Amino acid sequence: LYNWTSGGLFLRRAASGEQIDSLRLVENTNSSGQSAEELIRNEKCTAALDDSGTPTSLQSVSYSDTTWSLLFNCNSIFASTELRQALASAAVSAVEVPDGGLFAEAKGLIPDGLTVDGIDYRQAAGDVRPALGDPRSLYIAARDGGVSPADFGRISLLLPSGSGLSDAAEQINSAWQKEFSLFFSVEEVEPEEFQKRLESGDYTIALAPVQAEGGSVY
């Protein structure tokens, strides 16, 4: 960040070949409901954020720094690998990508559209989602390994409020009910409380964001 004024935010970086080394970000207050494509074509701005998911003839770059994932607290009944895999496998088969264009199906923890030394990471790494296997068979293996129905008391699926994933959480929970006859509650809390509970281990299952951090390949 180089400077900020009423005229916008000014960003700079070291010059490198033909790459852009300076940028001004301006809030558009006169868009009149125009799409990102219309803003670029009609107002001649260089780039605009697009959350519609609508195909366009303009060049686009997909961007995300967050992948939503199921986290299981292993200091609980979910110490069983087979049980975690059973629930994860059922969830993958059941959940639908939320509408609105803000979400896309994840192909791994690291989002699409990221490059490392100029190489497209996803294209180079491929689809790294594990092949978990049949959820019912995994659940039976967990039961054979000592998991008891009596151990499933007071389990909830925790997620932060305002995430836009309430329906997805309900879909996942319904799949667990249908596949395993397991009845968990869905618990939404404020983001601050959600983070505190994750850090303290005060959860059994969480639908949590894995986000970019400094020093990562993100």
Regions flagged by a language model, labelled:
Residues 6, 16, 140-212:
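Ligand/substrate-recognition segments at binding pockets and active sites
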Residues 1-3, 56-65, 70-81, 116-134, ...:
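Short, solvent-exposed loop/beta-turn-alpha elements that line the ligand-binding surface or hinge
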Residues 7, 12-55:
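Ligand-site clamp/hinge motif
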Residues 41, 45, 77, 83, ...:
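Sec-exported extracytoplasmic/periplasmic mature domains
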Residues 34-39, 52-58, 192-218:
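Pocket-flanking alpha-helical
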Residues 89, 101-144, 163-166:
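Structural transition elements
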Residues 12-14, 29, 61-86, 90, ...:
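A bilobed periplasmic-binding-protein/Venus flytrap-type ligand-binding module shared by bacterial periplasmic
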Residues 32-36, 79, 83-96, 106, ...:
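Stable alpha-helical elements in mature extracytoplasmic
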